[in-house]
Design a protein with these regions (language model features):
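Conserved phosphate/ATP/ADP-binding segment of small-molecule kinases
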Residues: 136-216
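Short, small-residue alpha-helix embedded
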Residues: 46, 164, 226-244
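Active-site-adjacent loop and "lid" segments of alpha/beta metabolic enzymes
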Residues: 31, 35-38, 65-79, 134-139, ...
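Conserved N-terminal subdomain of the carbohydrate kinase-like
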Residues: 4-28, 44-131
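Short pre-catalytic strand/loop immediately N-terminal to key active-site residues, enriched for Gly-Thr
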Residues: 30-35, 216-230
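Glycine- and other small-residue-rich loops at beta-strand/loop junctions that grip anionic moieties
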Residues: 32, 98-99, 196, 228
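Phosphate-handling active-site elements
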Residues: 51-55, 215-217, 242-244
Length: 244
């Protein structure tokens, strides 16, 4: 039984305490991955491990096993919009992460949502899409480049994937550097680019955060002689949580 002599806690004090103790919210747009390697599964795990709370918007689902992707089933863009806006109207969002969302229509829907939250950093991940139909790839990349890159704070992707996408006519004797790729991304409005998996001598790879003007940070890793999936989604989700 409550003590009748106790005074009620001031509502404003409760709200202040909640805001100070509640984890930051990261909205992530991504596909379900039944294998558990990437997609929303990776996002939710990585965001939680970095101390933030996921607002997970399902954009579709991969049809895959642990070895390869066979297909992708995209949701209707209205279903994606309804999920996102319902959560956004209820909870404050501190960062937005965009993974593979499956169709130009969903890219457009997310771009429209993001434009209403222009002050929130948007971290975009571009995975390897070589498993997909060539025409579908072209349409998706065109929509992403035109609609989402102008709103992107940090673009994340593997060196070869970003090279093929942003510098398709590269004619240099050497492969493009992280700064070269950052310059290409900057032409569409992206201030920061995190390029992963840059080949180095002696079985090492380099991950580099760059702007067109400078390399801001780099970290060298030993290359594993193994096939794995989900690293890009995990990295991008963790970065989103740290920026939230």
């Amino acid at each position: 039984m409550a003590n009748p002599n106790s005074s009620p806690l001031d509502t404003r004090q409760m709200e202040t305490e909640d805001s100070e103790t509640s984890p930051a919210c990261v909205m992530t747009f991504n596909a379900n991955d039944p294998s558990g390697a990437g997609g929303l599964t990776a996002d939710i795990s990585a965001i939680a491990s970095a101390g933030s709370h996921s607002l997970a918007v399902v954009t579709g689902s991969y049809v895959r096993d642990t070895a390869e992707i066979f297909d992708h089933i995209a949701f209707d863009e209205d279903a994606v919009t309804e999920q996102a806006r319902t959560a956004l109207e209820d909870m404050p969002v501190s960062a937005i992460k965009v993974g593979f969302v499956g169709s130009p229509e969903i890219v457009s829907a997310i771009a429209e949502i993001a434009s209403d939250y222009a002050e929130v950093p948007l971290i975009a991940y571009m995975p390897n899409l070589s498993w997909w139909d060539e025409e579908a790839i072209d349409n998706y990349l065109d929509a992403f480049r035109e609609l989402l890159l102008p709103q992107t704070t940090v673009l994340v992707g593997n060196h070869s994937s970003l090279w093929r996408w942003l510098l398709p006519d590269w004619a240099g004797e050497k492969s493009p550097s992280a700064r070269d790729i950052a310059k290409a991304a900057s032409a569409f409005g992206v201030p920061y680019t995190l390029v992963t998996g840059i080949p180095m001598p002696d079985q090492f790879i380099d991950n580099v955060l760059a702007t067109p003007q400078a390399v801001l940070y780099s970290e060298k890793f030993e290359r594993f002689e193994a096939v794995f999936a989900g690293a890009g989604d995990t990295l991008t989700a963790a970065l989103s949580a740290l920026l939230a």
